[in-house]
């Protein structure tokens, strides 16, 4: 996995929004013990994430939704990359692509641990985020009635996903939380 500072000679960092590049390189770092390398890089962080997942799909046979379909990838003893292999996928047609986790209560059968403090286990949230990234998504609405301090919001951001909202959280504010120290009445 290469970023600008460690790209092998002859491999240029792609340019654009979320562009990924895969390239087989011989003698990538002259003078080192590495004779061949498969370079996975991107124009930005998500482009690099997509390069990793594209390599795992194409070369390792990992289905983007393997966990959800109960089809784990087959174990491999070796991977053959054709000499001179190179692929670059340009910027996506649509700048933002994502999911709205509507009816997320249907996933609550995967109970969270007490430390999760969320309706769905953080381990399951991680699988949701992984599948979205493997499918080259980049944004998510993680819940209805979500608060910005909830752990799944941070977890999505840590995975490189943009957080967005829908009509229930105008401007990112969940208006259904009333401060504990302010009296209210439904009368």
Predicted regions and their residues:
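Aromatic-lined carbohydrate-binding surfaces of glycoside hydrolases
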Residues: 1-7, 93-187
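Contiguous, structured surface segment used for ligand recognition
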Residues: 1-91
């Amino acid at each position: 996995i290469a970023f600008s500072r460690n790209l092998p000679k002859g491999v240029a960092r792609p340019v654009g929004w979320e562009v990924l590049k895969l390239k087989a390189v011989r003698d990538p770092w002259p003078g080192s013990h590495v004779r061949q390398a498969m370079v996975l890089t991107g124009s930005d962080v998500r482009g690099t994430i997509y390069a990793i997942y594209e390599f795992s799909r194409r070369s390792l046979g990992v289905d983007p939704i393997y966990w959800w379909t109960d089809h784990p990838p087959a174990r491999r003893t070796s991977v053959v990359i054709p000499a001179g292999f190179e692929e670059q996928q340009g910027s996506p047609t649509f700048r933002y692509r994502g999911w709205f986790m509507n009816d997320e209560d249907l996933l609550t059968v995967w109970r969270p641990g007490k430390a999760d403090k969320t309706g769905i286990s953080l381990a399951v949230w991680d699988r949701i985020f992984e599948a979205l990234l493997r499918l080259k998504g980049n944004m998510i609405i993680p819940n209805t009635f979500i608060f910005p301090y909830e752990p799944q919001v941070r977890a999505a951001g840590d995975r490189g996903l943009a957080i967005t909202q829908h009509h229930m959280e105008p401007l990112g504010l969940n208006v259904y939380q009333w401060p504990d120290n302010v009296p209210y009445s439904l009368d």
